[in-house]
């Protein structure tokens, strides 16, 4: 999200003293300057940056550091609090008690609006056991209608469309259909444009006045620049938005402009999309995003995702086998399947706490490596995955797997070598646990 973690700037530029002391202006001048540069580089709006720096300075200058307090952690806590305030302070969840709940989705072309509409329907279905209806109102792009229908079928959600018929008439008919079929969440996927224009605004107004939506959500691409602020301001002026959904936060986008919207327009970000998978939509928690910007990770969201998508029994079984030294390639394949459910390597990495940035190239390399391994593992028989020693006894099996997977012999050799190392390491950790020793001591934990 940001090229430099703010916590690393504090470590590098904050002038700390050893004894009890009061933080002075000169102690934070350089660190605030570097934070300002980082925020601007991330495309955070200038007015937002000025307000943020001013608020941090007011909170920190004159702060007395008591004996036993870590001044660095004091400053980080103040920065986190002010970042959280800028981002909206508290999560803004949609009230699902309304029946039916009507949501109008708007956005420019390419923002991910149609995919996000399907993700939102899937979210309400799985999280609240609702019966959603997806309505295609983008009559100018037949491909958008087809896309929404395909996504609806993929997650078994009801779909309504009337081709190129006037979208206001279609919206009205959809309401009747929803009533007849007892749909309790109605999502209108409206037309997108390359830019906001009078014709589009008039159409959206007419739809809004007919369906009286409970939520009007503007879908924003995280890769958008400062112009998105003008777009959001214009839509809000005419339609009275209730919030935003930011998409593509799993990309290497700076996202600063999108994250500036709440402070500038006093409207909440309701959800974020962090992947292409239909389940990759999360409630926007300002404090958790502040942690990511600081470099503290977002373990809570990662744990929640794991609880939602991972098969607990399979995960426990594989882990138990690993710790007693019985890990085989079938276990490895199962663990990789489970990991894939959490999202891309990049998505997971960005939720882990660290003060050094893994380059996007390294993350893509890891993603590609995992895909190659999955291809080779699926080219093996169950016997080969359960007993990889057969590759040494019968080398012809390697030739078959290499040909079947379309990979090179070296790729298979690397897979087998790294699996052997991982098996040995997990077995060592299991023995340490068995004898009451800390298996993570070797990592300084």
What positions do the PLM features span?
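Non-catalytic terminal/linker segments enriched in charged/polar, low-complexity residues
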Residues: 1-106, 119-120, 126-136, 154-155, ...
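Flexible beta-alpha connector loops of hexameric P-loop NTPases
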Residues: 24, 65-66, 70, 109, ...
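Short, surface-exposed alpha-helical segments at coil->helix boundaries
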Residues: 46, 141, 145-149, 229, ...
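Short beta-strand segments
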Residues: 106-107, 189, 219, 273
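Conserved lysine of the Walker
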Residues: 113
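Switch II (G3) loop of P-loop NTPases
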Residues: 132-144, 154-211
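Conserved phosphate-handling catalytic cores of large alpha/beta enzymes
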Residues: 171-174, 183, 195, 199-209, ...
């Amino acid at each position: 999200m940001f090229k430099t973690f703010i916590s690393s700037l504090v470590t590098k530029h904050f002038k700390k003293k050893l004894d009890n002391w009061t933080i002075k202006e000169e102690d934070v001048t350089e660190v605030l300057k570097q934070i300002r540069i980082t925020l601007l580089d991330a495309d955070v709006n200038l007015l937002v940056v000025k307000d943020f720096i001013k608020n941090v300075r007011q909170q920190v200058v004159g702060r007395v550091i008591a004996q036993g307090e870590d001044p660095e952690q004091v400053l980080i806590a103040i920065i986190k609090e002010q970042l959280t305030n800028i981002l909206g302070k508290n999560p803004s969840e949609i009230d699902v008690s309304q029946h039916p709940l009507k949501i109008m989705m708007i956005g420019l072309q390419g923002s991910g609006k149609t995919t996000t509409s399907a993700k939102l329907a899937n979210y309400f279905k799985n999280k609240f056991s609702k019966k959603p209806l997806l309505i295609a109102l983008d009559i100018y792009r037949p491909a958008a209608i087809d896309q929404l229908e395909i996504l609806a079928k993929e997650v078994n959600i009801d779909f309504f469309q009337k081709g190129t018929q006037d979208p206001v008439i279609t919206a009205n008919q959809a309401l009747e259909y929803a009533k007849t079929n007892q749909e309790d969440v109605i999502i209108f996927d409206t037309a997108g444009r390359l830019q906001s224009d009078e014709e589009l605004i008039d159409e959206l107004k007419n739809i809004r006045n007919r369906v009286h939506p409970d939520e009007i959500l503007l879908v924003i691409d995280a890769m958008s620049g400062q112009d998105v602020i003008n777009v959001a301001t214009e839509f809000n002026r005419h339609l009275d938005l209730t919030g935003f959904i930011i998409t593509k936060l799993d990309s290497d986008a700076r996202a600063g402009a999108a994250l500036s919207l709440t402070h500038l327009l006093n409207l909440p970000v309701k959800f974020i999309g962090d992947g292409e998978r239909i389940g990759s939509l999360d409630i926007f928690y300002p404090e958790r995003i502040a942690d990511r910007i600081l470099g503290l990770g977002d373990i809570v969201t990662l744990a929640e995702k794991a609880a939602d998508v991972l098969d607990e029994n399979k995960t426990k079984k594989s882990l138990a086998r690993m710790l007693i030294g019985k890990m085989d390639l079938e276990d490895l394949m199962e663990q990789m399947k489970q990991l894939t459910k959490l999202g891309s390597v990049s998505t997971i990495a960005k939720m882990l706490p660290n003060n050094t940035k893994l380059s996007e190239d390294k993350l893509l390399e890891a993603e590609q490596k995992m895909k190659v391994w999955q291809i080779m593992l699926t080219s093996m028989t169950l016997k080969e995955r359960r007993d990889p020693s057969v590759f040494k006894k019968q080398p012809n099996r390697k030739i078959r797997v290499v040909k079947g997977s379309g990979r090179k012999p070296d790729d298979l050799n690397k897979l087998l070598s790294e699996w052997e190392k991982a098996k040995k390491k997990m077995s060592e950790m299991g023995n340490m646990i068995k004898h009451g020793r800390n298996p993570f001591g070797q990592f300084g934990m």
